[in-house]
A protein has these predicted regions:
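Conserved catalytic-core segment of nucleotide-activated headgroup transferases in glycan assembly
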Residues: 5-91
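C-terminal alpha-helical cap of glycosyltransferases
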Residues: 178-201
Length: 201
């Protein structure tokens, strides 16, 4: 089943300076793979760099177990449901998607890419985004060490990575809008029609 992002995200440019220098995770927090991802990040990554790179967890229905874990650490904000999460996502240092479980394409990653943000994701989250290239459209990190190194480098010299957000937006505009899918389907139907004509001759 194809996934398309809302076209207005490509022009989204609202920012909030309160979130500068932080990283954000977004997703419904009653979905177990999202809980698994946040728990992994908090324990393995935030515990090491949270004093310099705070974490914002955006999403409805965070379970009590997660809130108890988060309460053990400084520099973590749990927002719950947010009417306009893109203002936060656009403002942060990077969006993280350290998915450890689950499968399928992550809309949150597509949307983060569509607004021109830098996304640091696990290989599991990146794999379904066909055509996306590590170091060009997003940054893949699978271990805690890779996350720590990547986010630290981003914090120290984000301008060096700014091109990734721009390339991500162009990539999503070309491949993950409903208009792009329509073009692919029309082309497929046309090719099938021509093939049928050739076989009939």
């Amino acid at each position: 089943v194809p996934h398309g992002v809302k076209p207005d995200l490509f022009e989204y440019d609202e920012c909030d300076p309160r979130y500068t220098g932080k990283v954000a995770f977004i997703g419904k927090m009653d979905y177990q793979p999202n809980v698994d991802a946040v728990e992994w990040y908090v324990r393995k990554v935030h515990s090491r760099i949270g004093d310099k790179i705070p974490l914002i967890i955006i999403g409805a229905f965070p379970p009590k177990k997660l809130l108890r874990l988060v309460g053990q650490y400084d520099n973590i904000e749990v927002t719950g449901f947010v009417q306009d999460p893109y203002r936060i996502l656009k403002s942060v240092l990077a969006v993280v998607a350290p998915m450890q479980t689950g499968g399928g394409i992550q809309n949150k990653v597509l949307e983060g890419m569509a607004i021109g943000q830098i996304n640091v994701v696990s290989g599991l989250a990146a794999r379904p985004i066909l055509g996306a290239v590590d170091g060009e459209h997003l940054l893949i990190a699978d271990t805690a060490e890779q996350y720590v190194r990547t986010l630290t480098e981003l914090r120290e010299n984000r301008e060096r990575f700014a091109f990734i957000g721009e390339k991500a937006r162009s990539f999503i505009r070309s491949h993950y809008t409903w208009e792009a899918f329509e073009d692919v389907y029309v082309e497929g139907i046309e090719q099938a029609r021509k093939s049928k004509q050739l076989n009939a001759e």
